[in-house]
Structures are given as C-alpha cells and as structure tokens.
Amino acid sequence: MNFYAIRAIYFHEMDRMRRTLFQSVLSPVLSTSLYFIVFGSVIGGMIPQIEGVSYGSFIVPGLLMLTLLTQSISNSSFGIFFPKFTGSIYEVLAAPISSLEIIIGFVGASATKSLIVGVIILITATFFVELQIQYPLLMFFLLVLTCLTFSLFGFLIGLLSENFEQLQVVPLIIVTPLVLSLIHISEPTRPTD
C-alpha cells in the first residue's frame, strides 16, 4: 500500500477545506447554532423537562447527526466529482495509485472534515443548551462510523454523477427521506404512556 499517495490525496482534500473554510466549516456550524438558539433555547425554554432532559438537550444528537450525514455526503461527493469535472482526476489515475488508496484518501479526508464539523457543533451546543454525554466513547465511535459510512456513500454518488444537478439531487432524494423516516420511527413520535 502506497501511504505517500494516500497522504497526498488526504492532505490535498484537507487543504481544500482550509481554502473554503467558511462554506465547509463555519456555514454548517452557524446554521446548526441557529437551530440551537431557536429550538433549544427559545422554544425549549417553554417546554418542561421530561424525565430530567430538557428539549434543547434532546435535539442536540439529532441535529449533530443530520449535519454529519449531509456534510459527509457533500464533502466526499464534491471531493471526487470536481476533479472529475475539471479533468484533473486523470493525473491521479495516471499515477501508480490503486483504487483502494484513492478511496482511502478521499473518504478519509471527507470523514475527518465532517468529524471536525461535528466536534465544533458539539462544543457550540454547550453554549446554548445544558448537555450531558452519558457514553462519550460510544458516541465518538458512532460519530466516526457515521462519517465513514456516509463519506463512502458520497464518494459513490460523486463517481456516478454526470453533472452538478445529479450531485445534489441524489442526496435530496435518498438522504432527506432517510432522515425523515428515522425521525418518524424514533421515540419522539411515539406515545410515552
């Protein structure tokens, strides 16, 4: 395995995050912070605690996972689609790099970027709502697993997309119903008695 190639692809993608810091890190953090302010603090202050858990604390995991899903897919799909669109992917394909090494580089960078955004959102949430994490190691494991899984899914979307419309419509058709169905089958929609 060519670790130099993996490292080169990984750091090239991480450098792209540095160049587009506002849209890749600050934008999702600010939009999620607005949810924490509106739903967690303002509306959550009017809802009584249920079994010692405030409404603001209750919505933090859902908002965190929703951001991780969308960021993992968009980071990975755009990361492979844009070089394909501009033609610079041929330089990577001409190099002595296996397909597995390309996947590890792109998906690893996408998962890292998404995890960074997730950790920043988690830290930001503590400013707006009272947050207590019961199992931090399990939570971190699930965050990493979610980032890797949906980064692989986004990489596949980026490979199969022919234009920018396909790049955006597939997550809209698949991820949005997935998130809505997870909300529907989860505990908030079931009676508690």
Regions found by a protein language model. Name each.
Residues 1-137, 141-186, 190:
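Hydrophobic transmembrane alpha-helices and immediately adjacent juxtamembrane helices
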